[in-house]
Each structure stands twice: as structure tokens, then as C-alpha cells.
């Protein structure tokens, strides 16, 4: 399996979710299964089947997170000598050449992406267009809504 790039914040969020699933959700579901078993016939016991389905989901998510964390490559953009270039973890201020609107994005791992918070996946069209570019460069992005052109105003590594 290939390395999964994560920011330190993204890795910490995954660790917190894993901890919650193991210490809160797993015991709660085990208790729900035990209570449902006490109600008798398991074939027609909706509570039992719902709890088992939840258990399956939680155990699957635990395995998924453990796999991602074991293959994680935590990247601190401030520690990389990027010399003004856009790299994974960088925060980039852009100006849309058509509308003049300013936008700010941080390039993060798949699991961290949240466009509403300005966090774009390293595999997204905009991140792929930005990687390796520097302040002052114009980039063309093949977005779902058509081609967009942006100017890179500032690149930060925080």
C-alpha cells in the first residue's frame, strides 16, 4: 500500500476518531448487543440486527483508520525547504482572473479535505494545478464547471 500524505492536524484528527471509536462507540455497541440478546429470539430481533450492523460499520472504520495511520506520511510544510513553491500542506491565496474574487486553499490529504473550510485534497484538480507553482504564476484549473484561471498571490507554510 502506498503512503498516505497527511498534515499533522489531519493525523491527529484520525487518531482522535480512532480513540473515540475504540473507547466510546465499541463498548456502547457491545452493550447494545448484549441487551438485545436478552430480548430472546435473534432472528426477528430488530434491535439486535441494528446493533450488529453498527458494530460492523465501526469495526470497518477502525480498520480503515488504523490502515491509514500505519501508512501515513505526516508532512510538515514548514519543515520542507519549498523555496516559495506550492507543496502539500501549503496554504495558497489565489485570485480568480475572471471574477477578481480572492480565495484561500490549503492542500491536504484526502481525509482532511473540506472545501467549505478551504481544505482541498492533494488529488483535486485545483491542487494538481497548483503543486510546483509559485507566487505570481497563473494556473489553469480544469474544474467541473469548466476551465478557471487563477493567479497565485501568496504561498504560506504554517
UniProtKB/Swiss-Prot annotation:
GO terms for biological process: DNA-templated transcription elongation; regulation of DNA-templated transcription elongation. Residues 53-73 form a coiled coil. GO terms for molecular function: DNA binding; RNA polymerase binding. Necessary for efficient RNA polymerase transcription elongation past template-encoded arresting sites. The arresting sites in DNA have the property of trapping a certain fraction of elongating RNA polymerases that pass through, resulting in locked ternary complexes. Cleavage of the nascent transcript by cleavage factors such as GreA or GreB allows the resumption of elongation from the new 3'terminus. GreA releases sequences of 2 to 3 nucleotides. Belongs to the GreA/GreB family. NCBIfam families: greA, PRK00226.1-2, PRK00226.1-4, PRK00226.1-5. This is Transcription elongation factor GreA. It comes from Alkalilimnicola ehrlichii (strain ATCC BAA-1101 / DSM 17681 / MLHE-1).
